[in-house]
Amino acid sequence: MRILTLNCHSWQEEKQIEKIKYLAKIIHQNNYDIIALQEVSQSINSKVLFDNIKEDNFMFILMKELERLGETRFKFLWEFAHIGYDKYEEGISILTKHHIKAKESFYVSKSKDQNYWKTRKIIKCKIVYNNKPISVYSCHLGWWDDKEEDFKFQANKLLEHVKEDETCILMGDFNNDAFLSNEGYDYIIDKNIKDIYSLAKSKDNGVTIIGKIDSWEGNNMRLDLILSNKNLKVEYCKVIFNGIRGEIISDHFGVEAKIEF
């Protein structure tokens, strides 16, 4: 099973449509089964097309581009988390080729006010792959030392939805650097959660942030992770869209993995 996670930084990028087209091309070429995206936005004032999806929804435009490339197997889920940059409904999304058996979304932040930019939501779906049920989560969590919305609270809320009798794959921007000891990364790993990167036979340096971006100063960091509650057989886990493996299309790099089921 091939999987990908990316914080899209959507509608904050120059040449955004070109970057959506490039993302669609790579998804098509690499034949991913599941993609988890974060910072998937649509304009507050744009026209509603169906359900909660508006005409400039990043995921909707990505889907249309995939269809243009002849890829018609994907289904997507999108959930509005909070207002971003005063003009966007920012959310999280999952894209998959496989039948979605169940879906849900839930808050992990203390706040449930969608006008507050620190409000955090998770989207989850259940699929079947090679006759095996798998639960997939797209995650965007807060910072370790945030006094209003601390990471511990959010991680605990997330893990309440991770069931021992399910194979769970948690993908996304965890906003906690895996290179730092005794902070958010160690906290969640100590809850019997496995890092796919650590399990992988083949891997690179794992860096998904270089230099300064929103709220982060100048260090190389591994914020974007693929985690599981099970010891899975992982062929590789590598960074993509970093200028070395694929063009840069966001202020985060993506992470892809191949897992054997």
Residue positions per predicted region:
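Short, conserved active-site loops that position catalytic residues or coordinate cofactors/metal ions
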Residues: 30-33, 37-46
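A basic- and aromatic-enriched beta-loop-alpha substructure that forms the phosphate/nucleotide-
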Residues: 42, 52-55, 59, 83-94
